[in-house]
Amino acid sequence: MNVNIVDLNAVDAQRLVTESLIESGFAVVKNHKIPVSELNALYVDWDNFFCNGNPGQYVTDAESQAGYFSPLFAETAKGHEAQDLKEYFHYWPGGVLPGSVEKLTLRYYDAMFSLGKDVMV
């Protein structure tokens, strides 16, 4: 699969993102305005949460699919025999976030949502 890298400073950036999404379902963008330092800080916060926090108290809500997904309940992808052993946390607006990651997560969510609107409008 080939995923194009789209420069958001390009005159036709919106068209290129759309084409990439149609072709592969993904778009990789560069020259967005979200600082890498903010993403790195977010990784540090979430790493601390998974290593030192209590993720089990944020177990996934079955209806919204928001919250903590444990590797103990890993899914098996269609056509595969082995489970996909990973842990992660889904967040949706209005969902619960651990206090230690809330501030940066919400700020990053807002920045990414704004970026998406700018690119797709």
Predicted regions and their residues:
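Peripheral, non-catalytic segments flanking oxidoreductase cores
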Residues: 1-121
